[in-house]
Design a protein with these regions (language model features):
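Terminal, non-catalytic protein-protein interaction segments that mediate quaternary/complex assembly
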Residues: 1-212
Length: 212
């Protein structure tokens, strides 16, 4: 339904680096059942969940560029985004991989939720101010599409709200839902280990630019 709306009733139509683009802004939705991780309707699903699982496992390993190249060996479309910088303006180890950022913050997020069930501070930041170094450069390294994910417990359920600055809804949205839903379940499992008997709650998602 979201893709039909963007395609048939776009708020804006323009040419971008991905070609002719249909866009709506300030779009939100809620995933009814984040426990499945999957698009169950075969008419909607556009991704290979074997690839999605590989992507998730790599992300949670916290690996860097070399590990990414090994994980996605043979997948040319993925490999082009996990290369070292092409210009001397950036350090050779510069990257915007989500995995190291997520793995570094996970203990703090889990401990905050376990210690304070009413917390509003369990926010995992993805976009980093250092990423702005990419703005004037012509690099294949992707400027992060995700701002952050905020986790909160209400009525004995773990909820998450994901904020995206930019979202390709035709295909990439599906893998992003998979990754965030599995990460949500991972955090839930870790909280159970600490004695917090919670259920999966709401998975809400906001996109500044939803486009295809």
């Amino acid at each position: 339904q979201l893709n039909f709306e963007i395609h048939d009733n776009p708020e804006y139509v323009f040419d971008s680096r991905i070609g002719k683009t249909h866009e709506i802004t300030n779009a939100s939705f809620e995933v009814e059942d984040p426990s499945t991780y999957h698009m169950l309707n075969p008419l909607i699903n556009k991704i290979d969940y074997g690839y999605a699982e590989t992507f998730y496992d790599f992300m949670m390993s916290g690996g860097g560029i070399e590990e990414a190249q090994q994980a996605f060996k043979g997948n040319e479309s993925a490999l082009k985004f996990v290369q070292p910088p092409e210009t001397d303006a950036l350090p050779k180890n510069f990257n915007t991989l989500y995995g190291p950022r997520i793995v570094k913050q996970l203990p703090d997020i889990i401990n905050e939720l376990a210690a304070n069930r009413n917390s509003r501070r369990a926010t995992m930041m993805i976009l980093n101010p250092d990423d702005h170094a990419l703005l004037p450069l012509d690099e294949k390294i992707e400027y992060p599409c995700c701002f952050n994910a905020t986790y909160f417990i209400r009525d004995d359920a773990l909820n998450v709200h994901v904020d995206m600055r930019s979202q390709n809804t035709a295909v990439v949205l599906q893998i992003d839902i998979y990754l965030h839903a599995r990460l949500m379940k991972h955090i839930l499992d870790e909280l159970w280990k600490l004695g917090s008997k919670l259920q999966l709650g709401k998975f809400s998602y906001h996109m500044v630019s939803a486009h295809m």
